[in-house]
Amino acid sequence: MKKIYLLLLTIIPLLYSCYGGEDSTDITNIQQVTAVSGISNDTYKLYQGDTLKLSPTLSFSEGADTTLYTYRWLIGKSEVISNSRNLTWPVCLPNGYSMAGNIPGVFVVQNKENGLEFRQTFTFQVYSNYTPSCVVVYEKDDNTIEWMSLQGEPADFTRYFDNMIQRINPEEPVKGKYTGALYSTNELAIFTNNHPDYGKCISMRNADPDNGYLYNVGEYTGNVYGKMYMGATPSLNIHNCVFGYGASKYFICNDILHVFNGLDRKLPVFNESTFVKSTEVQQALSSKQFQRYKKATFVLHKDGHVGCYHVYDDVMENVKIDGKPFVLDSLYGCFTEATGMGSNKPYSVYLLGSKDGEFNLYRFYVNYINRVVQPLTLEAKMPVDATFAKTTKFWWGSFGESYGFYTIDNSIYRFDYYEMNSFEPSQAKKLITFDADEEIIDVFPLIPGMGLRDEDDCTVVLLYKKATNTSSLYVYDTVTGRKIKEYKDIIPGKAVYFTKCL
């Protein structure tokens, strides 16, 4: 203890000596940087050949002379890449680091007179030329299926490469009718009706032999039949494929609903007896906000009864209303409530379904007790006009606001579901209308960055123009409808699938 007191008594006068001027000026008057903004806390995903541009905003102490500061940008093992305040850096892999690994960086602002430094750290990863940050799968007019690698963020893709199969596997095109796709971090499966392979499994990352991964971006890792499916059934019908990061991934194969761990980076291996959630399944439907926080999935069986499950390894419940089985003819749409809360917290889920020609919007309450999910409770049953319901195509919700959305023809509508106990289409606002010759193929609401959070980023819409057999990506602010970016006719075919890579 004596040594500690002695050390403190020695240091304190030194601090006053360094920070204090004449008459013992308060250390808060020292010229210094007080904050730096404009550098993301999320990991930057960069590509060789691109240019990283960062323009941080600096806040200084009152009265500071901003001409007295120097700047340094360091990456990796203290490699200086710039001495300017704003960074413009041609991306390359620093010495001693591997592709896709986390690389440290720091922005240093130093006062030349008093030597004080402010350091803002960041992290980035470097990927090869073809490594995707987003993927589009599309059908071509020669009855083959292709995929596109897009790099950057949806708000500003820096590069994109179409016809990736033609580039890397020109002798083995993906043939047959597209039935679905499943992303699994390391790989992408494209399912078809083509016998005997029933589709291809494709690497989405570079080889990492030290960790047993031997395939580069775009290379086939195997056929669906033989790599994923390991059973004895001679034919496969895989469809209704969904990937919810942190929740589960699932598809229906030959009327069997198979559900897998949403965190597994590899494509699943299965047969008729493994990963079975239910059999005699007609349809499965989750919210488009499907992820770890909102993971209810409704399962419609061929006999009409509706089940529900929440994670890949739980037991599906048969939903009941007033003690009787919940029975429907079809599931039309689903979206979840924006709560701002994390995983295993209560929320409401909305389901649009039909029975005997009548449509209703059901609101169920999902409750957790000690992190254990409880049976669904019906909160409200709202009649929906049948003619209207049949004209809608997609339903989804905002991650952060109490808004729901649906599409009719080439328009997107927004409605407020806060304290909603009846559904009135007349109260909805037409948010966006696309060109008359463009068909909405699908809609994908996204969250910011690479993590999980109940927060809106943007929504990506796949649009198809039949006259030119081309597809576009339209990116807009999820809540306001404000256009962020449009990538007009960049896809040489009919887009059928989009995913953000993790």
Task: Kindly label every feature range from the protein language model.
Residues 422-484:
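C-terminal structured domain segments
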Residues 164-171, 185-395, 399-401, 414-429, ...:
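Preference for solvent-exposed, low-hydrophobicity sequence contexts
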Residues 174, 327-334, 384-392, 434-447, ...:
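Repeat-based blade/solenoid architectures
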Residues 1-4:
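Positively charged n-region of N-terminal signal peptides that target proteins for export
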Residues 134, 249, 297, 404, ...:
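Hydrophobic beta-strand positions that form the internal "hydrophobic ladder"
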Residues 175-181, 185-188, 238-239, 391, ...:
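Signature of short aromatic-glycine-proline-rich micro-motifs recurring in repeat-based ectodomains
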